[in-house]
A protein has these predicted regions:
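Non-catalytic, usually N-terminal nucleic-acid engagement modules in DNA/RNA processing proteins
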Residues: 1-64, 68, 74-76
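Short acidic, glycine/serine/threonine-rich loops at helix termini
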Residues: 24-27, 75-80, 149-154, 170
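Extended two-metal-dependent nuclease catalytic cores across DNA- and RNA-processing enzymes
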Residues: 2-8, 33-34, 84-187
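Short linear sequence elements within intrinsically disordered, low-complexity coil regions
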Residues: 27-30, 52, 79, 84-87, ...
Length: 187
């Protein structure tokens, strides 16, 4: 596929909601990001700042945000120790995700989630669907597992400094950085 072919495709921006919000949660200070009722908002602020930058820079035709629903996915059922070593999600973070989903809804940005699948599974499905429909996908995530999805019409925008800097991973960038093709990138 030529660069011109790719440039003429509609663009869908796929956001890994929890991944981006979690990065913002740890990148920004909580001071000054609290409502009068005590609700923390700094993860949402960082997420929306990144989204604003992405919309300005990438000019997507469509945007979808995928979120995790918890620990009841098929992986947890098949392998109970799946992600068992992870620390408990801070309570200050949980409330911010629901607030962020409300803001995205108000902005007209659809959100998807599933009790059976993680957000990155949903993003993989959406990316493949977009490709089959003649679109190109930009996936914004801090999850390197998504590098396996990269091809001539799928690019991963990976945050490297909190929520302010994104690295564009294409097949060439994956090969340059890791000396493997996206399909060879370990899961």
């Amino acid at each position: 596929m030529t660069v011109e072919d790719t440039a003429n495709r509609p663009v869908v921006l796929l956001l890994d909601g929890h991944s981006i919000a979690f990065r913002a949660f740890y990148a920004l200070p909580p001071e000054g990001f609290t409502t009068s009722g005590g609700q923390h908002t700094y993860a949402g602020y960082g997420f929306l700042s990144m989204l604003s930058h992405l919309v300005t820079e990438e000019k997507p035709d469509y945007i979808v945000a995928a979120f995790d629903e918890g620990s009841g996915t098929f992986r947890h059922q098949e392998y109970p120790a799946y992600k068992a070593q992870r620390a408990e999600t801070p309570a200050e973070f949980i409330g911010q995700v629901e607030l962020l989903r409300e803001v995205l809804h108000a902005l007209g940005i659809p959100t998807v989630s599933s009790r059976e699948y993680e957000a990155d599974d949903l993003i993989a499905t959406l990316s493949l669907t977009a490709k089959n429909e003649g679109m190109q996908s930009f996936i914004c995530t801090g999850d390197r597992d998504s590098f396996q999805l990269i091809d001539d019409v799928t690019t991963v925008l990976y945050p490297t400094k909190g929520v302010s800097t994104l690295v564009r991973y294409t097949p060439e960038k994956v090969k340059e950085r890791y000396n493997v093709t996206p399909a060879q990138y370990p899961d």
